[in-house]
Amino acid sequence: MNFTPGEIYFIGEKDLRTKQITSYYKVGLVRENAENADRSSTQRLLEHQTGNPRELYIESVVKTDLVELVETLLHKNFAPLGVRGEWMLLNATQLSEVQKSAEQLASEAKEITADLKKAEELAKVASSDELIPSTPELLALNEVYLESNAKLKACGEMFNAIKDIFAEALQDEDEVEEVGVFAQIQERQRSVFDEEAFKSAHSAIYAQFVVPKATIKGTPSFAGSKGFKKDFKDFDPGFASMVDGFTSIVEKIGLGQEKKEYLHGFSLELRRINAEATWSKMKAESTIKVACGTHAGIDGVIKWARSEKVTESLDKKALKLSHPELVAEFTSAGDVVKAIIVDPKKGY
């Protein structure tokens, strides 16, 4: 995880002729590290000014830990207000709301950063065989984790269904114009190295580049995660209504009673919920892991046995440097993979 701190800046713009401040605001970040020692929000302002016919100014700056994560969550939280890239269209009330959200996320990031770092460190430490007793606080956090995880899963399922609908529509010339405004099909093709064939043909060379690696491994398992059946209406009635109404919306679109643009708006709301659930899950998970420490788990909350595992893997980078012609011989173009890209903003 990237723990780099930095600044979240709000850049506004002013019309040079009328002197009127527009409702467009760029919400971006500046990382605070050795590579960016001479960069600041003021420097970014000057860079953004190039090519912009309106005068730019810094509306506000929020300093924060986890600056990349905070910026990502902020844009997801307010996806329906985004227009393109990092730009948002905000009235005075909405601007204040986004700024307050940035400050709140920064405050929470400051509190959680130490636990997130500690949790990453603990993942690299072998555990004992001992389970420790739970506490009411940890049991409550486990519920938060389970609820957040369930929401993320449901969001993912609905978002995938939306992408399938858009993908089908983009294959229909009568619907491309409507759907192409907020969704596109992207094709990718990656080269594939046939490791097994190379190993069979050049076993001696292959053996020279097989590297043993000792790592601590152990997947955390949260109590109740496999059989979680809690109804959404019991902990988030608003989200329950969205889930319950989704099938009806899809049916109406299939019957031509609703435009597919509605689904794009729905997908933006899913991004907001995803951001909230991701943040809640991260906070609960890191706190539980830190409480678990080097123990094998917490009774009724988490099982997290970790032990050293030795694995062997091919050092492909070193092999390619030493035998580029052989690697090229066993490398071929992979299948073309199509992905549906849904606009994360409402720029129309």
Residue ranges and their predicted role:
Residues Y145, L152, F159, S267-L270, ...:
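Heptad-repeat amphipathic alpha-helical coiled-coil interaction surface used
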Residues A183-I185, R306:
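Conserved catalytic/binding loops enriched for acidic/polar residues
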Residues W279-A305:
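Intrinsically disordered, low-complexity segments enriched in Gly and acidic/Ser/Thr residues
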Residues A197-T215, T219, A223, V310-Y348:
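Acidic, glycine-rich two-metal-ion catalytic cores of nucleic acid-processing enzymes
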Residues A140, T215, K283-A284, G347:
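Eukaryotic low-complexity, Ser/Thr/Pro- and acidic-rich intrinsically disordered regulatory regions
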Residues M1-Q171, V176-V179, V192-Q208, P212-P220, ...:
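Non-catalytic accessory segments flanking enzymatic or RNA/DNA-binding domains
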Residues I162, F166, L263, S267-L270:
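Fold-core signature of tandem repeat domains
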